[in-house]
A protein has these predicted regions:
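Bacterial Sec-dependent N-terminal signal peptides
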Residues: 1-35
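Short, surface-exposed loop and linker segments with low hydrophobicity and enrichment for Pro/Ser/Thr
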Residues: 14, 46-56, 79, 165-166, ...
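Flexible, processing/modification-adjacent segments and terminal tails
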Residues: 31-37, 106-180, 204-207
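Intrinsically disordered terminal and processing segments
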Residues: 34, 41, 45-49, 92-94, ...
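N-terminal mature ectodomain segment of secretory-pathway/periplasmic proteins
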Residues: 37, 44-113, 150-158
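Catalytic loop of the DD-peptidase/beta-lactamase superfamily, centered on the K-T-G motif
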Residues: 93-106, 111-129, 237-252
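Gly/Pro-enriched, hydrophobic low-complexity segments
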Residues: 161-253
């Protein structure tokens, strides 16, 4: 009996040592790469020639919402000239926001004078134009945009299983005045391609959304995610899908 007891005790100790070693190994494996190193590798995958800063093109985007409605948008971006234009269909009309440097032009079916009701219905404000400029250049410029001033790249990289797949996860926050949300970017551990990103307005409340990326469009040497499916963090409810149907060269302005 005594001999058996010692065997069991030794076996228990070995199991504990194995578990401890496994946990230490798992943690160190994720930390073979730092946050900045992961970001560098991801940018090398998506923009190997460093062309994003000179991006000049038009994105044709189809947005399909959960209720089946479709919205078509054309987004033209010339980063070098600080040019941005969004043209989108809304309620049977075409809304356009054009920004060149600090000059903003708002249009509704080509006209630039609006009633108060039109301004409210179609969100025809300069603030909205700036928001949409930041929205599209950020989302379609990832992961390169994570090099922008104000981004705080956490040094720790987490290895995490999400939706049945394993990823390297980079955490990013922003300096005050730049952004308030907490962001998490999920990269393929082999290719370093960006596969998912997730944001929280308040992590404690588990609010916000996650966006699943599939397929790619290659334009000017940049690998741009083609399809983005949006879901709520809480409950995983499906919201919408943005599909990049075409990328074309932007004609000279």
């Amino acid at each position: 009996m005594k001999h058996s007891f010692y065997h069991k005790k030794a076996g228990t100790i070995l199991i504990k040592i194995f578990i401890l070693c496994f946990c230490v190994f798992s943690k160190s494996y994720a930390q073979e790469i730092t946050g900045q190193q992961l970001l560098k590798k991801a940018i090398q995958y998506h923009d190997p020639k460093g062309n994003w800063d000179q991006f000049k093109g038009t994105l044709a985007i189809s947005m399909q919402s959960a209720d089946g409605k479709e919205r078509l948008s054309d987004v033209s971006i010339d980063l070098a000239k600080q040019f941005f234009k969004l043209s989108t269909a809304k309620n049977g009309k075409t809304v356009a926001y054009t920004i060149l440097n600090d000059k903003i032009v708002l249009q509704l079916d080509g006209k630039t004078d609006f009633t108060e009701e039109e301004i409210k219905t179609y969100n025809l404000t300069e603030a909205r134009a700036r928001f949409m400029q930041n929205y599209y250049t950020y989302l379609y410029g990832l992961p390169m945009k994570l090099n922008d001033p104000g981004a705080i790249i956490y040094p720790e990289v987490e290895r995490k299983v999400f939706l049945g797949q394993e990823y390297l996860v980079l955490r990013v926050k922003y300096e005050e005045g730049t952004g308030k949300d907490s962001w998490f970017f999920y990269f393929d551990p082999k290719t370093y391609a960006l596969k998912i990103y997730q944001f929280y307005h308040d992590e404690a409340k588990k609010d916000g959304e996650y966006i699943v990326l599939t397929d790619e469009e290659n334009f000017s040497g940049i690998k741009i995610p083609k399809t983005r499916a949006w879901y709520l963090n809480q409950g995983g409810n499906y919201l919408a899908t943005d599909t990049l149907t075409k990328v074309s060269k932007l004609e000279a302005k």
